[in-house]
Each structure stands twice: as structure tokens, then as C-alpha cells.
Amino acid sequence: MKENIKVSTAVSWTWLSILVVVMVSTNLRSPITAVGPVLGQISEDLQLNSFQSSLLTAIPLFMFASCSVAVSRYSHKLGMHRFLLFGLMLLSVGIVLRVWGNMPTLFVGSFLIGLGICVGNVVTPGYIKTSFPKQIGLMTGIFAVAMNLTAAFASGFSLRLGEWTGLGWQGSLGVWVILALLSLIVVFFDGLGRKKAPGITENRQATSGIGYIFRSRLAWYISLFMGIQSLIYYSLISWLPNVLVDYGMPKEDTGWLLFLIQIAMIPIMFIGPILAHRMKDQRLMATAVAIGMLGSIFIFWHYKLQGIYVAAVLLGLSNGLSFSLSILFFTLRARSTANAIKISGMAQSVGYFIAAFGPPVFGRLHEIDATWNYSFYFLAGSIVLLLFAGWKAGEATYVAED
């Protein structure tokens, strides 16, 4: 009888752990992807120039870069649930401040949003490795799909949400606080249940420092792969609506093209990690990512609105696979949960530092060349570096532990 109760309790908390992964992941992109379609409204309302506008996307990325190492160092010592709760609280406050209606709170809110998302970015891969050690590929796929499905809706419905709420861009961006608060409740009950339920523990332990990770060549390749694929993603999420408007697309249709890109990412983000987990190494997948990205960038640049939907789907597939590979590398290249979190911390710190330069550089190159040619050359060169880093990170080996 007692054994049946233990089994039933363990199954219940397994489902709750799945819900934690899903709910946390839904908050890790949507507050950022919702910005692109309403960026023009924000700039007009608050009188922002091009550089200030690009900071709305760049600030969260700089926060990912500056805080990921600290989060990875202390989360395993102090508890993943505490950090997730703290991150969701920061995210909720940041969303509210960002839509307050003036420039200072706009940027302070963006700062807090970046810090809150940083916690989820770093800790969730470790949570997956701890809670689902035998289903890493599957749970990474679920994590990536949930993240990008909500990101797709955030970009596709951003303008509509502003119209439906009657609050304009403030409604478009503010509505996401509801999801953050619901996620906070789920994480709270999961942590509470692990304290009370028999046999359900968080596996908290003291770990060595993170410095040795930065001496690993493999960890640097993983970080570069993470950074360059994020740079490409955030550059296009931020500026593609403006590019398409210059090409002649109606402004109201640009959000739907971003929606199509995000939707195209979803199938490959679910299937990709499962297949990659079963492969001897992931170098072939890294090559496929680079080919797909180069193809989509070429169509956007050369054919403009002709073949635009083919380019969008191709970009979604290649970007979806590149992101899932990045997250999967954190766990596949680590022998322990502690090491997975440290690799995640380094990769996201270095990676998002690289990515944060994407939107400002892409926008600055457009100021130099109004045809967007220089901006697309910048992305093409980045993809070549992505292929090199992916080929190295895809080798079947481990980051050595201290």
C-alpha cells in the first residue's frame, strides 16, 4: 500500500515537473519577440532614435551575458526552485515597469526582464537533467517547443493584442505578466511538493568554482555556437519587420511573417533534439543549420518579397534546429547536473554577449547602407563562423570536470 502511494506521488510530481518546464519556457522569449511588431509605435510614442529602439532587444541580451555565470555558480548551491521563483518575480515586475509609459521605466523594465529570463535560461537545462535524466532529448524538445510557440504568438498577435486591449503597445507587451504570474505559482507548488513528498528531492549540493569551464576549448565552441545563432535570431526578430516594410510589405503583415518563422521552428525543435540525442555526434546537424540559414538569408536579400514565405519557413527550420542543438549541447557535453548548469552559464554569458551586438550592428549597417545589403553581409559572415563552431561543438566528447 505504501509502495503504491509512493509510486503515485512520484508520478504526480513527474507531471508537475513537466508543467514547470513548459510554464517556465513560455516566459523565456515572448517578452522579447513581442517587441518587434510594435517597435515603431514605441519609438513614435516615446521619441526614440534607431539606437535607442534597438536597445529594447539588446538590453535583455546584455543581461543574459552579464548574469549567466553568477546564476550558474550559485543556483546549484542555493536551490534551483528558489532561483526560478526569483527570476519569475523579476520578470513580472519588469514587464509592468516596461509598459509604465516613460523612457526610464521602459529601460529599467527591460533590464529586469533580461535578468529574470537569464535565470530561467541557465537553470532550466539543469532542472531537466536532474528531473528527467533518461529523457533529456524529449524534454529539451518540449522545452524548446513551448518557448517558441509562445514566442510565435507573441510576435504574431502583438499588434492585435494592443488593439483588443485598447492600450496600444502597452497592452501588447503588458499582457505577458499574466503568464509570468501563473508560472510563478506552478514553480512554487513544485518546490513545495518536493519538500513534502517522499523520495522527491532537488539534489542540491556544493560544487567547485566555474573557472575551469572557461579553460575548456569545447565549452568555448559551445558558447560561440550559442552566441552566433542567437545573434542571427535576435537581429532578424528586431529588424526584419522594418526590412519587409522597406521592401513594400504592409506593416500589419510583418508580424504574421514573424509568426510563420516561429511556427516553422516548432516541429524541428521537438524532433531535432530527439534525433540528435541518438546520433553518434551532431556535426551533420550543425552543417544543415548553416546551409538552411545561408539559403534563407540569400532569399531575403536577393529576391526580397519574392519567395518570402519559403525564406521564412527555411529560416524557422534552421533557427529552430540551431537553438535546440545549443540547449542540447549543455547536457550532452556534461557528465553531471552541476557541470550542465556551468556549461549553460558560460555558454549563455558568452553567447548572449555576442548576440547583444547583433541588433545594434544590423541597424547601424542599415544607416550606412539603406539597401540593407551590408546588414545581410554581416549575417552571412556570422553563419560561416556558426558552421565552424557547430562542427567543433558537435564532436562526441565531454567538457572535463574540475
Can you describe what each PLM-predicted range is?
Residues 66-104:
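Conserved MFS/SLC helix-loop-helix module at the cytosolic interface between two early adjacent transmembrane helices
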